[in-house]
């Protein structure tokens, strides 16, 4: 027996049903989008009211400022965006991070001859606080990170490199890849590293280790001690400065020397 073909009417019916389902789906999607837009608008309004109410706390308290920034991020609001909108006029946070960015640049330039353009976030934070004086708004390390991210518009000069549980701030336009970052992390505890330490810890060939260290030397980010016992030591000024400061604090507080 031959199967009967599907009639033109049935095909038309099927297409009409599909079109209706598609139309219904579009309407539902538009409704959901409208509801989400209304919710976001309501969140934004509430956030503006919250900001107006807690304006002074946001400006003066670094921890409160972090929480506020996180609240803004959840609905895609950037209080640091340039331009004179509600946020910059209400809170002055745009000006705050701009001024902080300028101060960060000044500190990094002043110390560049000493550390080659790399500094720990903790040391940068200390210098920034020292330069601001007692009457200025308090600044947290989170504030410094946010200000540095805004400085990226100036080019690839400024960046943040994770090292262990902390960060290094890069203020020179040196190209640092993953190999360089791993070596910086390895040098974190002592402030220096050797070719053999890199080879044994990272399972690298000699040439790869030397290539990375030579690049750091060329960029002024590392110094070499050729007279060190055993083999040459490659010192990272940013790291050993921080370690030296830690040691002084321990000595002053009566800790182990």
Curated annotation (Swiss-Prot):
This protein's UniProt keywords: Coiled coil, Cytoplasm, Protein transport, Transport
What organism is the protein native to?
Xenopus tropicalis (Western clawed frog)
Cellular location(s): Cytoplasm
* GO BP field: forebrain development; multivesicular body sorting pathway; optic chiasma development; protein transport
List where this protein forms a coiled coil.
28-50
| Residue ranges crossing the lipid bilayer per the database entry | none
Quaternary structure, from the entry: Component of the endosomal sorting complex required for transport II (ESCRT-II), composed of snf8, vps36 and vps25.
Q: What is the purpose of this protein?
A: Component of the endosomal sorting complex required for transport II (ESCRT-II), which is required for multivesicular body (MVB) formation and sorting of endosomal cargo proteins into MVBs, and plays a role in autophagy. The MVB pathway mediates delivery of transmembrane proteins into the lumen of the lysosome for degradation. The ESCRT-II complex is probably involved in the recruitment of the ESCRT-III complex.
What name does this protein carry? Vacuolar-sorting protein SNF8
> Which InterPro entries has this protein been placed in?
ESCRT-2_cplx_Snf8, Snf8/Vps36, WH-like_DNA-bd_sf, WH_DNA-bd_sf
Task: State the source organism's domain of life.
Answer: Eukaryota
Does the record's keyword annotation contain Signal?
no
Gene of origin?
snf8
Q: Which Pfam families match?
A: EAP30
- Name any GO cellular component annotation: ESCRT II complex
The record's comment on protein family reads:
Belongs to the SNF8 family.
Family annotation (Gene3D superfamilies): 6.10.140.180, Winged helix-like DNA-binding domain superfamily/Winged helix DNA-binding domain
């Amino acid at each position: 027996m031959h199967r009967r073909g599907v009639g033109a009417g049935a095909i038309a019916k099927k297409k009409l049903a599909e079109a209706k389902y598609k139309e219904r789906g579009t309407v539902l999607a538009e409704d959901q989008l409208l509801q989400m837009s209304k919710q976001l608008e309501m969140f934004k309004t509430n956030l503006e009211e919250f900001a107006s109410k807690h304006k002074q706390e946001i400006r003066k308290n670094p921890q409160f400022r972090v929480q506020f920034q996180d609240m803004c991020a959840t609905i895609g609001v950037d209080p640091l965006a340039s331009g004179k909108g509600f946020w910059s006029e209400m809170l002055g946070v745009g000006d705050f991070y701009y001024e902080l960015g300028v101060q960060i640049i000044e500190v990094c330039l002043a110390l560049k001859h000493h550390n080659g353009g790399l500094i720990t976030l903790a040391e940068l934070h200390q210098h920034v606080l020292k330069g601001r004086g007692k009457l200025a708004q308090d600044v947290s390390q989170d504030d410094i990170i946010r200000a540095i991210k805004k400085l990226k518009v100036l080019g690839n000069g400024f960046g943040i490199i994770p090292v262990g549980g902390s960060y290094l701030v890069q203020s020179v336009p040196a190209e640092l890849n993953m190999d360089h970052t791993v070596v910086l992390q390895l040098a974190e505890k002592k402030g220096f590293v050797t070719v053999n330490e890199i080879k044994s810890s990272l399972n690298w060939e000699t040439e790869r280790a030397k290539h990375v260290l030579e690049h750091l030397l060329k960029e002024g980010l590392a110094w070499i001690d050729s007279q060190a016992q055993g083999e040459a030591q490659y010192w990272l000024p940013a790291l050993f400065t921080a370690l030296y400061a830690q040691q002084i604090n321990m000595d002053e507080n009566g800790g182990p020397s």
